[in-house]
Amino acid sequence: MSTDTLMFTATEHGQSMHAKVKEFIETQIEPIEAQFWADCHAQNPDGDWTKWHWPEKYESLRKQAREAGLWNLFLPDDKLGAGLSVTDYAPIAELTGRSLLAPYVFNCNAPDSGNMELLWRYGSDEQQDKWLTPILEGKTRSVFCMTEPDVASSDATNMQATAVVDGDEIIINGSKWWSSGLGDPAVDVLIVMAYTPDENKDRHHQHSMVLVPAKTAGVKIERMLKVFGDYDAPHGHGEVSFNNVRVPVNNFIGGPGMGFEIAQGRLGPGRIHHCMRCIGAAEKSLELAVKRGMQRTAFGKPLLQLGGNFERIADARIKIDQARLLTLYAAQKMDAQGTKAALTEISAIKVVAPTVLQEVVDMAIQIHGGMGVCQDTMLPAFFAQARALRLADGPDEVHKTMIAKLELKRHGFSRSSSKPVKS
């Protein structure tokens, strides 16, 4: 990302933090990243997630980052985070997206960043002390359980998992999958979204978020799921079942029926972070493509001078810059007017950024040839990230439908009527 872009998006404080993060990534993370992931694969057998662990010799990196004040930067709180706005943090998220390791080092990787912000905004004092503080300190990890295996999760009201009040307890039953981070040995708590029936409330106030300690009786990790053949150890994406799981009634976050409202509050900034990380990954992919294409020759010329590759590089540059500017606009609007006012822009970037990343990575893979699909570059991981993100957190089709509905409303129409709606 150029400093010119920073000039019209970030405050002086944001620019300063951006410079520090950039230097840390370039000097401390990038030189050891390839070895880190090689060690992860060597030390974490795919077939047995119960033995997964993070290579201990790299923990000093996290300690260095924390001591340098590069810790929990996504959190806008001055004491718990760095006091950065969404707009300030967005370019930093882009930097972390260039690396597969950086989000872990800075304690800002998903789903923890979203879960921490959720607990910071909506958690009670007791919940924050018990669950938020250890995650903020990097001592524990968390999981967000929303998607279910037996229903179309593009309609969140389809949820079959239930969270029913029984006296001073909540009883949870059901299954969730694609619960990211479930294989991490440091996971201590799951945030579970489930159906809480209440005939006195509308359909969008009958779902709740519940804090479930990972070792509660009745919680069972069924399996880890491969993404394009990779388990993503030691993080993992798993399927988990809840069989008559009982937790205290004060484990509701924000109270029963608040699930959808909290989800929107969690997912708004989170989508900015996801999309800027996508843009960072796209930048890295383009950089790799240019270097590979100019250093390799065929028929007496650099690869980039053959077969329309100049145009492919130009298209990538244009798409990345367009995606970045749209995402920064969404961030600025969210800061200035709130998440609700930026719903169109937030849905738009959720469609655009992963798609741009997928297209740029595909181009970079083609330039690299066989090397592009093996473990010698980040490209396969970036491709998996892009393709999965077009489904995670709402598929493209859901976001496009949202954009269209908001556009009709802006012009005075409803989805079902061809006549303007009277205001």
Labelled PLM ranges:
Residues 158, 215-246:
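Flexible, small-/acidic-enriched active-site or ligand-binding loops
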Residues 168-169, 173-222:
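A short core secondary-structure module
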Residues 106-126, 155:
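N-terminal glycine-rich flavin-associated loop
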Residues 138-147, 192-193:
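A short, Trp-centered hydrophobic/proline-enriched beta-strand micro-motif
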Residues 160-162:
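Short, surface-exposed charged micro-motifs
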Residues 81-84, 221, 251-256:
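Cytochrome P450 core scaffold surrounding the K-helix E-X-X-R motif
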Residues 150-154, 181-185, 200-201, 228-236:
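Short Gly/Pro-enriched turn/cap motifs at secondary-structure boundaries
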Residues 1-100, 109, 122-127, 134-139, ...:
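Alpha-helical interface subdomain recognition
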